[in-house]
């Protein structure tokens, strides 16, 4: 996978050098680069923002520098895909492998500043990249979306600042890439970099070869629509608090049932909306019994909460 990040604060993305993501880049599993839209400006102050039309507080990111930066990374991704296809063709000689630095800062465009630019095109050897625009106005980012993005070949993240990026940048980008505005949640950050750090980590850890033990992904929170069960390690007794006896029994079937029960009860307590999103027909009798103890019941194929009122996914009863 190739990931490009557009940001006027490239140093903000340096944590991506660390841990498993940094190792994945070093090992060639992932290509990660950061591009600064300021490198595509034409004035000596490298201006990337201006006052909003219609008045109002704050500044708005100008569309031209961001579009030029986007064009550059789309072209780079298309060239890389074409080169990869050429290397795998039978008549082509095998190219030597080269190490990829953890976070690359892309150079500015090779054309003269202010020169006319033509509309960029996606390389025919790969699908159109996905442009993720972090925004409080976007769709809420979830584990399901992380899995969807992990299946893509090329992701581009545009880290807006201030009041956001001129909407014409997004409208123009839709003619060449697949645009996906995403939000971490119902709150506002100073810029998109923090959101991108979270999204990139959530996505890349799902790529084969990034996580050492793939089985760990199958037991995490949100996998299967439930939160993860509690975990424990040595010592068996710590400050007079003992590990649940069932985990010391060695009885794998009972341990699996205990963990499932913990997932259900924890999710019902902390995220009742996730229980409401479950298909009751996919739960066994033991599952339904645990949920009944937490106040969730199935009547006529629909969820009901204690208190006699119906509960639907769209209007969860957040106790």
Region spans (language model):
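Structured adenosyl-cofactor binding patch, chiefly the S-adenosyl-L-methionine
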Residues: 165, 169-222
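N-terminal nucleotide/polyanion-binding subdomain common to many enzyme families
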Residues: 1-76, 80, 104-107, 254-268, ...
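Short, hydrophobic/aliphatic alpha-helical segments
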Residues: 36-47, 143-149, 174-175
């Amino acid at each position: 996978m190739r990931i490009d990040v557009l940001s006027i604060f490239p140093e903000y993305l340096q944590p991506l050098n660390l841990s498993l993501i940094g190792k994945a880049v070093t090992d060639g599993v992932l290509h990660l680069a950061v591009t600064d839209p300021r490198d595509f400006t034409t004035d000596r102050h490298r201006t990337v923002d201006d006052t909003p039309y219609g008045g109002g507080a704050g500044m708005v990111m100008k569309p031209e520098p961001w579009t030029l930066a986007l064009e550059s990374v789309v072209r780079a991704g298309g060239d890389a895909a074409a080169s990869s296809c050429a290397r795998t063709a039978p008549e082509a000689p095998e190219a030597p492998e080269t190490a990829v630095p953890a976070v690359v800062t892309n150079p500015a465009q090779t054309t003269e500043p202010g020169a006319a630019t033509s509309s960029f095109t996606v390389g025919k050897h790969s699908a159109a990249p996905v442009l993720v625009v972090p925004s409080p106005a976007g769709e809420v980012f979830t584990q399901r979306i992380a899995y969807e993005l992990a299946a893509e070949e090329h992701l581009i993240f545009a880290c807006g600042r201030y009041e956001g990026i001129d909407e014409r940048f997004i409208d123009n980008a839709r003619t060449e890439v697949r645009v996906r505005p995403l939000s971490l949640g119902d709150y506002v950050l100073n810029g998109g970099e923090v959101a991108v750090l979270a999204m990139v980590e959530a996505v890349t850890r799902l790529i084969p070869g990034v996580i050492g033990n793939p089985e760990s992904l199958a037991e995490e929170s949100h996998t299967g629509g439930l939160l993860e069960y509690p975990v424990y390690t040595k010592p068996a007794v710590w400050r007079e608090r003992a590990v649940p006896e069932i985990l010391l029994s060695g009885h794998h079937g009972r341990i699996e049932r205990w963990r499932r029960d913990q997932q259900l009860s924890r999710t019902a307590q902390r995220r009742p909306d996730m229980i409401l999103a479950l298909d009751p027909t996919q739960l066994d009798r033991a599952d339904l019994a645990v949920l009944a103890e937490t106040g969730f019941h199935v009547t006529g194929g629909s969820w009901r909460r204690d208190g006699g009122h119906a509960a639907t996914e769209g209007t969860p009863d957040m106790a």
